[in-house]
Amino acid sequence: MIAACAGLPTIIAPLRSSLTLVVVALFVACCTIATPAAAQSDSGAQAQSQTVDSTRGPVTGSTRRIGLGGAFVAVAEDTEGVAINPASTAVRLPYSFQDWNVGFGLDVSVGAWLPKNDVYNQGNSASQDQTKADKSTALFGSVALLVNYRHFGVGVSAEATRNAASRANDTPGIDTHFAANFGTVHLNMAYGFLDGQLLLGAGPRLIGMSFDRAGSSSVLGTAGVGYEAGFLVKPIRQRYRLAAAVKSPIDAQLAAQPGIAASNVHVPWEVALGAAYQFGPRALNPRLVTAREVAQQTTGHQDPTDAELDHAALELFDRYEARQRWYLLVSSELSVIQGGGPVGLSGQMAMDRPVISPRVGLESEVIPHYLRLRGGSYYEPALIAGTHSRTHGTGGLDVKLFKWSVFGLLKPFNYWQLSLGADAARSYLNTAFSIGIWH
């Protein structure tokens, strides 16, 4: 990761900060749960309490999810899918040849490039009142671990987001010159029934939040636990997938301060419905075939030797490399997010109604074995009274880099790749990058 950023000093600092946020996400989301007393209200508080709606409009996540315009619930897989659809934890990839599989992923995105970057879609124009934010920024990082045994999967994903906003005036009930830090941990289990054609998954969602108020050394923190579940239908040798994921709401309470009553923080429920279709000769839903199965068929031995297993794995690798590479994947998603409180994260009045966001994305390997491109778009409804919705355009790529097996640990897949993603809309620009293995 750091090597890929050499010569880009403007990226190094955000990267360090984002990695730090990811490391503490587990601590923020878990340790604060163990100290609920810190979130109790102060009996001497005088000001009226507020419920803060933590709904966020722009898409965050992996470079692939951003590049596809957030249309990801039906194609989520590998470590990128753990936080999106719990059922994706059981997806076995076509280049996974063993009964056991272990995956690790890391993504970083930075949304702070524009002089008037408007993360919260507050409408930063001179014609609007001075309570609008001068600038808002976002920094996102995620790390995920996935373990599979055949059609069973266990995944954990830790996401961290830091959103900062500044405004000229304050809104009663919440300080609006602040930074909001979110740590989210997803712990999912899933199984693929019918030989991996019907995948069901579920698990808890742990969220920790802290709010740094400008001009004050105090940091308000809280945490909560919710649940998430999902399914994925991927018939073998068919060109389509259908999926849905549900995340329950979470309510927590920020501690009171002298003269200020406790505030409730509401993390909304989310529902995502998705469908995907793939054109071209490349299979979207291949059957899981392991080296053990191939070795048993070719040798007739129920317990193949290590050498026979290695030979079978190389045979599967050669089949994978020789398969047709061109494809055009079309993915769509309808995301519905609850609106939950009168005050938004920016400190302005939020609209208490469901947020409906249609999304669409395209992906293709335009240069076989070397380059994948993706593009997409999604609709971001207005979350704050008096502002306008906006349409996002997204894009991304995976490019094959150099060959390095890390002293033989990564064979036979030993080429590295750079993945980039970008999301642009009115007064908004977010970029993401990651380093991984080319498949």
Feature-to-residue mapping (PLM):
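N-terminal leader/targeting segments
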Residues: 3, 7, 22-25, 373
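Secreted/extracellular small peptides and ectodomain modules produced from precursors
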Residues: 3, 28-29, 381
